């Protein structure tokens, strides 16, 4: 149980780091850890007229691949489904609402942050 709590605390720490990084780049915070049956969205931000669904990935080393490589095809599908659910839940039209999927990859205890806009292409 302690290992799971420690992992969750670490996840929250890096999500907050990513949120602050994006806020420094003029994005507005909307929500963190939105959960549904389809999955979880780490961060929901707003970039001018667009909603930004952000997946935060952290890796201490790149021995097993970079943080952004950890966003698998299956994870991308879950993110897309969860984002569409969030839009519908908030009475926003999928066809008439601007949104994108970004990844914030954090390496080396936060010394390196890589923000990848449009990392996941809808479709």
Swiss-Prot record:
Superkingdom assignment: Bacteria
GO molecular function annotations of the record: nucleic acid binding
InterPro entries per UniProt: Restrct_endonuc-II-like, tRNA_endonuc-like_dom_sf, UPF0102_YraN-like
Pfam families linked to this entry: UPF0102
Family: Belongs to the UPF0102 family.
PANTHER family: UPF0102 PROTEIN YRAN (PTHR34039:SF1)
Protein name (Swiss-Prot/TrEMBL): UPF0102 protein VF_2212
